[in-house]
Amino acid sequence: MAEQKGIFVDRSGQTEPAPELWEPAIIKRADFEGEIKRLSEMPMPNNGRRQSWIVHPDAHKLGVGLGLAPGIRPILEVLNPGEQTRPIRHNSTQVNFCILGSGHSMVAGQRIDFEQYDLFNFPSMQTYIHVNDSDSVQARRTYTNAPLLEKMNVHIV
């Protein structure tokens, strides 16, 4: 295999182009309620994750790493009563906010019970599942830095 050599790119006197700023975007309560209903009526996918990414209308302009803001992706996740996700782990960080119902998560063997309005996180690279052990629909908003890692091509799932 031939040796790869770095190259010099002369940028003398050049400035970076001004960033394209995004307009504010809002997702209303009624939109969340409609999406929770839609997701809860779907059959359970193979990975046990009914979810919708919440992305800014201009996010596609950045290519990989869709989010509501560059580097941040809110996700709406729904579990029906008695359901649980399959185990997963990744190097992105997540903050979970229960917006409807209750349940628990198992994170690296530790149980985290939660109910509506509870906020919790767990370290990256820890295997976890979410469980709805209640008799009503569970909905969580999860905020993740996965888009930032995807843009850097270092997101591991």
What are the roles of these predicted feature ranges?
Residues 134-135, 154-155:
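Short amphipathic alpha-helical segments
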Residues 54-57, 75-77, 96, 141:
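Residues in well-ordered beta-strands of folded domains
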Residues 84-116, 126:
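A short beta-strand-loop-beta hairpin characteristic of the jelly-roll/cupin
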Residues 1-71, 156-157:
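A short, N-terminal "cap"/entry segment at the start of jelly-roll beta-barrel domains
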Residues 148-153:
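A short beta-to-alpha transition loop/helix N-cap that caps and shapes the active-site region
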Residues 61-73, 80-95:
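A short beta-loop-beta micro-motif enriched in histidine and acidic residues
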Residues 80, 107, 113-134, 140-145:
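Conserved metal-binding segment of the jelly-roll/cupin
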